[in-house]
Amino acid sequence: MITIKKGLDLPIAGTPEQVIHDGPSITEIAILGEEYVGMRPFMAVKVGDIVKKGQILFSDKRNSGVHFTSPASGTVKAINRGAQRVLQSVVIAIEGKESISFPKYTSTELKNVGRAEIVKNLIDSGAWTALRTRPFSKIPAVDAEPVSIFVTAMDTNPLAADAELIINTNKQAFTDGLALLEQLTAGKVYVCKGETNLPKSESVNVEEKLFSGVHPAGLAGTHIHFIDPVSAVKQVWSINYQDVIAFGMLFTTGELYTNKVISLAGPAVKKPRLLRTHYGASINQLTKNELIDDEVRVISGSVLCGVTATAAHAYLGRYHNQISVLAEGYEKELFGWGVPGSKKHSVSNAFISAFNRAKSFAFTTTTGGSKRAMVPIGQYERIMPLDILPTNLLRDLIVGDTEEAQALGCLELDEEDLALCTYVCPGKYDYGSVLRASLSKIEKEG
């Protein structure tokens, strides 16, 4: 077992009841274009077109052969674009249950389907987009083959759903998905889990790896770093446990599986709990009559690295398993730095709340101050479990020194791996965005 001692579990109020409830009826669903790093769409539909579940909506010009398919049948309601015509979302008004059929197998047959057929089925159905590479956190090329594959079968994000509960309600589909994944690599498939009881694969190529401790113990980047680190010439893939279930269901039912169990939680949620819904579901519909106040920020994903769900982005992200809701921190506090802070969380023990570690707090979106220079006072080292020099790396990312950043390990990282650094930073830097800028530059220029 690998125990993560450096890190931080945010004590946020509004933890979800770990019981799965049926979510509300959804009439709109969307694919969010900006989730896919470097993707340049070639549209296959226009507004007003009628589409089936599993039908291609657009393809990636820069990653030939990768298709993005409709998660439901209905009518293309909107194609939203932002600055420089960047694709923000393709919205489908759900109607009917027509679906494109894909090859279907029994659980026994799955063990011998063959890599070529698995890849073709995943690409044709659009399920291929669930896979992500490391380095760069992009959708793999259709002809790529990873050294190994990591299944993230745990979640230590604040307010997250219990992975064990969800997997054990879909045991057969999960093991079917593992049987498919092991045929995609000549190496190992690592199922990274907590101290939980999960269905096991009988294959010697599928290994369970146990992780415990504080966040980021449940992140793919942490698992990859400790088990099979990547480099500029070595690529591994990662996939979330719910997508493993979706792979299994796709191949055994012959239909694209879009169901997802999410956590709807946070201090601004009336009844925090787990909901059964679909990826891409309208967040406005999922949160209707669920919020304590109107002045809130609804986030698709974790409070640490999620996306504000508004306007064209108000849909559940492809890689998100939770919706987090915080009150907006509009109010200014006079001499806030001088108050005891019994209701504020502090990493540096600046407030008296540090004496009560068991207390949870009604976090808001306030940053507690304005942006300023980076202040290296040892905070990053306290919450960074990876074998890197965080202060040096973050400084190089800020100034854009990609050569030094590579030497210090930036290729191993994704935005979520630096989210805690952003949280504890006295200078209020968003390290995820500067990391992405550096990774994009490295990929382009080497």
UniProtKB/Swiss-Prot annotation:
Class in the EC hierarchy, top level: translocase
Keywords: Ion transport, NAD, Sodium, Sodium transport, Translocase, Transport, Ubiquinone
InterPro entries named in the record: NqrA, NQRA_2nd, NqrA_C_domain, NQRA_N
Gene Ontology terms describing biological process: sodium ion transport
Residue stretches spanning the membrane: none
EC number: 7.2.1.1
The keyword Hydrolase appears for this protein: no
Source domain of life: Bacteria
Keyword Phosphoprotein among UniProt keywords: no
Catalytic activity: a ubiquinone + n Na(+)(in) + NADH + H(+) = a ubiquinol + n Na(+)(out) + NAD(+)
UniProt GO MF annotations: oxidoreductase activity, acting on NAD(P)H, quinone or similar compound as acceptor
Function: NQR complex catalyzes the reduction of ubiquinone-1 to ubiquinol by two successive reactions, coupled with the transport of Na(+) ions from the cytoplasm to the periplasm. NqrA to NqrE are probably involved in the second step, the conversion of ubisemiquinone to ubiquinol.
Family that this chain belongs to: Belongs to the NqrA family.
Subunit structure comment from the entry: Composed of six subunits; NqrA, NqrB, NqrC, NqrD, NqrE and NqrF.
HAMAP family per UniProt: NqrA
NCBIfam families: nqrA, PRK05352.1-2
Annotated protein name in UniProt: Na(+)-translocating NADH-quinone reductase subunit A
